[in-house]
């Protein structure tokens, strides 16, 4: 005997020719076991079978979004144009700062300046900023964006200052550049947050922001030390500290 649950919670004889008015389960007494099957037209198939994920059904929308033109990225997903542009801007920032630090390295490496510790510090700092730019380029490609390198401003070549001297003037410039870079990174993070891009936000937080704060703190201490020693013999001792103890930016 076959029974069907009615809408008013009453039981009636099963009519195989009748169309159910709503999705209802059907009880079938098959010899020694009770079988539950979906009634004709049932829309509650998942609840009856326990299936919560149907990959071949749900993937249809993603299949429609797969690019067919060779110029389009296959990896790109939930990566808006604003985020792509902001990453390219940050690449340009990192390269510009690297270029300035490289100019500072060349200045302090001159034979008539001969502050090898400061030269070493700024060379390592330049390499670090270039690595940051390359890391951003790799991320851009990973997300399916296009890297667009932009113009780099020609830096100064002379860094002596009549009142402060070259060492303090250069280190104050470095501190200002690190703070400016931090502002640019915070802007990139805000773009990611505004567009709900948690992957980009996490990338900026984990790879850049913490190190940037450490760099600002460290260079702030260098500025304070150089202000104490003035332009004289103390600069040579400071330079020797950088030369023998290291001190590149984070």
UniProtKB/Swiss-Prot annotation:
Lipid metabolism is among the record's keywords: no
Pfam families the record matches: Ferritin
Enzyme Commission number: 1.16.3.1
Bilayer-crossing regions: none
Domain of life: Eukaryota
Molecular-function GO terms, alphabetical: ferric iron binding; ferrous iron binding; ferroxidase activity
One of the GO BP terms on file: iron ion transport
PROSITE patterns, per the entry: FERRITIN_2, FERRITIN_LIKE
Localization, UniProt: Plastid, Chloroplast
Residue span(s) of domain Ferritin-like diiron: 77-230
Assembly and binders: Oligomer of 24 subunits. There are two types of subunits: L (light) chain and H (heavy) chain. The major chain can be light or heavy, depending on the species and tissue type. The functional molecule forms a roughly spherical shell with a diameter of 12 nm and contains a central cavity into which the insoluble mineral iron core is deposited.
Function: Stores iron in a soluble, non-toxic, readily available form. Important for iron homeostasis. Has ferroxidase activity. Iron is taken up in the ferrous form and deposited as ferric hydroxides after oxidation.
Descriptive protein name: Ferritin-2, chloroplastic
Organism: Vigna unguiculata (Cowpea)
């Amino acid at each position: 005997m076959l029974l069907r649950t009615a809408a008013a919670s009453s039981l009636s004889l099963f009519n195989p020719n009748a169309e159910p008015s709503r999705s209802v389960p059907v009880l079938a007494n098959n010899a020694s076991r009770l079988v539950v099957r979906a009634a004709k037209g049932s829309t509650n198939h998942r609840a009856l079978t326990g299936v919560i994920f149907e990959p071949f059904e749900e993937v249809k929308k993603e299949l429609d979004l797969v690019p067919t033109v060779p110029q389009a990225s296959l990896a790109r997903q939930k990566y808006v144009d604003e985020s792509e542009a902001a990453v390219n801007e940050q690449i340009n920032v990192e390269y510009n700062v690297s270029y300035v630090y490289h100019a500072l390295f060349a200045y302090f490496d001159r034979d008539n300046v001969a502050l090898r510790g400061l030269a070493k510090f700024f060379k390592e700092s330049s390499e670090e900023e270039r690595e940051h730019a390359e890391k951003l380029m790799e991320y851009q490609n990973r997300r399916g964006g296009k890297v667009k390198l932009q113009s780099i401003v020609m830096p100064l070549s002379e860094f002596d200052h009549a009142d402060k001297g070259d060492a303090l003037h250069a280190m104050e410039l470095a501190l200002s550049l690190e703070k400016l870079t931090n502002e640019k990174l915070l802007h990139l993070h805000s773009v990611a947050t505004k567009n709900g891009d948690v992957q980009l936000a996490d990338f900026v937080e984990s790879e850049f922001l913490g190190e940037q704060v450490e760099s600002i703190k460290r260079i702030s201490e260098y500025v304070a030390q150089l202000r104490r020693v003035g332009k004289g013999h103390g600069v040579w001792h400071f330079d020797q500290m950088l030369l023998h103890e290291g001190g590149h930016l984070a």
